């Protein structure tokens, strides 16, 4: 797979006539993935709110005024019960997210128990816990964690307009620690945060030129939450939501430049029309989050997803054992 894409090449893809871009993306998708199969994932907040980071989009930031009450890390048994319910509902991957800048070492034993317990159910595991040290990444790798999510969020150029408490390089460093520990990388970002198309080019370029393409690439549409910096700033402006065609273009370019990655249609789907979601699937999105909630924001819901799948002739992807990366010596 190519990891030497240039920004000029990616910009040219964005500029293609829409039908040509969709044709190219669907062709790439069919060469590397089963047609009509969508991976179902569930995301659980195992520790909500109180995060010291100032991410402008996030209702869980301590800098936001959303009325969200911070919680402690969930009990392991409660997490495993939620995982069992997700499995019964058809999910193949269980993602666990904690609103931390980085995990404390004292929390790692419980995190390991969660990973081992979910894997014992036959589900893929994913964690998003913030930045990781080398030692913490190794602990997660030894526990058998399949994927670690750490989004780059946006382009390097736009990043400082969204977050100031963690650098773009900090994010890349964590991804490197994850790869070195033999864990598959899950990394994507958010569109509709006031960025330009050039920023969306830079966002895709960063992911597509990593040493290895992420195993999963979640693409989120900003959900403006009142009380967050971006929610208040963009709620009453045209920048609050990029148009649907531009969002689909972003999905298509991600598919073309990262052919084997799972491209996940993530936050913001609840407000998308069925037609827009259908175009995203045609453009190469082949993974979604199920359930009524994503961390603290609304999601489409299982009933709506089942109805949409029936209309489009889509089917849930059967679980496959993820390929384990080799840990660096």
Curated annotation (Swiss-Prot):
Keyword Flavoprotein assigned to the entry: answer is no
Q: Which residues cross the membrane?
A: none
Cofactor(s) recorded in Swiss-Prot or TrEMBL: [4Fe-4S] cluster; [2Fe-2S] cluster
Q: Which UniProt keywords apply?
A: 2Fe-2S, 4Fe-4S, Biotin biosynthesis, Iron, Iron-sulfur, Metal-binding, S-adenosyl-L-methionine, Transferase
Q: Which PROSITE patterns match?
A: RADICAL_SAM
Query: Its Enzyme Commission number?
Result: 2.8.1.6
Q: The Radical SAM core domain covers which part of the protein?
A: 36-260
What is known about its subunit structure?
Homodimer.
Q: Which NCBIfam families match?
A: bioB
Report the protein name in the record: Biotin synthase
State the species of origin.
Sphingopyxis alaskensis (strain DSM 13593 / LMG 18877 / RB2256)
């Amino acid at each position: 797979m190519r990891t030497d894409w240039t920004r000029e090449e990616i910009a040219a893809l964005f500029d293609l006539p829409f039908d040509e871009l969709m044709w190219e993306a669907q062709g790439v998708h069919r060469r590397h993935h089963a047609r009509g199969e969508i991976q179902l994932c569930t995301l659980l907040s195992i520790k909500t709110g109180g995060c010291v980071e100032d991410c402008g989009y996030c209702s869980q930031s301590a800098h936001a005024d959303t009325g969200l009450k911070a919680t402690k890390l969930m009990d392991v048994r409660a997490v495993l019960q939620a995982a069992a319910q997700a499995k019964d509902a058809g999910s193949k991957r269980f993602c666990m997210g904690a609103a931390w800048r980085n995990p404390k070492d004292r929390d790692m034993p419980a995190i390991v128990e969660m990973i081992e317990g979910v894997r014992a159910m036959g589900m893929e595991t994913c964690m998003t816990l913030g930045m990781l040290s080398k030692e913490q990444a190794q602990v997660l790798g030894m526990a058998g964690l399949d994927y670690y999510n750490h989004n780059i969020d946006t382009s390097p150029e736009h990043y400082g307009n969204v977050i100031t408490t963690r650098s773009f390089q900090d994010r890349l460093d964590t991804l490197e620690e994850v790869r070195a520990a033999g864990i598959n990388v899950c990394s994507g970002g958010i569109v509709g945060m006031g960025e330009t198309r050039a920023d969306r080019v830079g966002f895709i370029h960063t992911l597509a030129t990593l040493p290895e393409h992420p195993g999963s690439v979640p693409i989120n549409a900003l959900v403006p939450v009142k009380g967050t910096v971006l929610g208040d700033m963009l709620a009453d402006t045209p920048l609050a939501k990029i148009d649907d065609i531009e969002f689909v273009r972003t999905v298509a370019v991600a598919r073309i430049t990262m052919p084997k990655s799972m491209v996940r249609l993530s936050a913001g789907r609840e407000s998308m029309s069925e037609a827009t979601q259908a175009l995203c699937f045609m453009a190469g999105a082949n993974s979604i989050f199920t359930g009524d909630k994503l961390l603290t924001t609304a999601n489409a819901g299982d009933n709506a997803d089942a109805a949409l799948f029936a209309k489009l002739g889509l089917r849930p992807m059967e679980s496959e054992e993820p390929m384990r990366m080799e840990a660096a010596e």
